[in-house]
Structure formats: structure tokens, C-alpha cells
């Protein structure tokens, strides 16, 4: 990555603030942000360096349902921009509903890997982790 001039850095900052709707929290300290605001700031900070991949650790933890939908929409937009995303999360439906491929770790080892549908349909996965009544809910982001 080519270093940015101070002017380019400021331009990128303004673009990310606009893209993630962070105007009202621009001068707030991190400990004053809601869970959803914090997640949007975290993702915007990652994008400041124009990455090919980002990792989101528990992005759906501690956020309200509206923020979950917002984060899912952001992830869908990042996928459209060909940015790879690695998500680690215990919120199974929220995560599987937006993933192309999933890896389930159980007792420190990969128990299963495949699409969300394959994972949800696997008998061993249901027995060890999901439970027999688990229902996969997929998201559609047609209006990005």
C-alpha cells in the first residue's frame, strides 16, 4: 500500500464517516458509543487501510437487532467489494445467514466445514452444537 498524504488521509476519513453514518459520534470517545456504533467504527477503521481481508470477532455480541441487521448489510456490501471477511461468533443464525462458507470448531478442532446449508443439515453438527430443532434463516440483501 502506498502511504497517503495528510490530505488523502483526511479525504478517506471523511468518506468512511459518511459511508458508515458516523457524523454524530465523530468526536465521541469509544466508551461512549453504543454496541452498533462501536461495530461500525471498528469496521470503518479496518477499511481505512484498504484491506483485502478483515476479521470480525463477535460482531453480533452485545448489539440490538437493528444493529445486527446493519452489520449484516455492511458485510454484504463488503463482499460485493471483494473484501474477504472472517467472522468468529457464537450467534449462529446471525452469522450463518450471511456466510458463503462456515467452519464449526468443537473442542478445539474443526468439526465441519461447508456452506451454511450443509452445516445446518449435518447430523453430527446438530448433535454436538446446533440441536435437532435448529432452523437456518438466510438473509437476502437485494436493496444494497
Model segments located where?
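Conserved ABC ATPase signature
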Residues: 29-33, 37
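Conserved catalytic motifs of ABC-family nucleotide-binding domains
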Residues: 50
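Helical segment within the ABC ATPase nucleotide-binding domain
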Residues: 69-81
